[in-house]
Amino acid sequence: MGSVTPNFTVKELACPCCGACDMDQEFMRKAQVLRDIVGFPLIPVSGYRCRKYNSSLRGAAELSQHPEGKAIDFRVRNLTGARRYLLIRTAFLLGFGGIGIGKKQFHVDGRKGSPVSWGY
């Protein structure tokens, strides 16, 4: 299937429902820069989602950026306070519009307007 960027593959980012992987190129360029700067693995858990699959997920945002190819949920091993800070700071500096952070996961998206962040 190949790579979308040096660190992220089509297989990792494809919709589990239909196999489509229509990720936005500029968004993926920024995701790769984020990975390069932080210097530790960001493992995609969810990337592109077709609208059908996205609407089937409980808790998925109505205006989710996943069907636009502008969102990724990552699993991050050993997500320490220092790593959380580095991820959040770098994502904001790179211009990601939405940033969510959980105990073991990290979300970035390409929404427009004022940046937002949340914990989950």
Protein language model regions, located:
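Extended, low-complexity, intrinsically disordered C-terminal regulatory tails
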Residues: 28-59
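Glycine-rich, flexible loop/turn motifs
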Residues: 4, 53, 63
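Extracytoplasmic cell-surface/polysaccharide-interacting catalytic and binding patches
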Residues: 1-37, 112-120
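Generic detector of short, locally flexible boundary/turn motifs and exposed helical patches
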Residues: 8-11, 38-42, 71-76
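Catalytic cores and adjacent binding grooves of peptidoglycan-active enzymes
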Residues: 62-63, 67-68, 72, 76-120
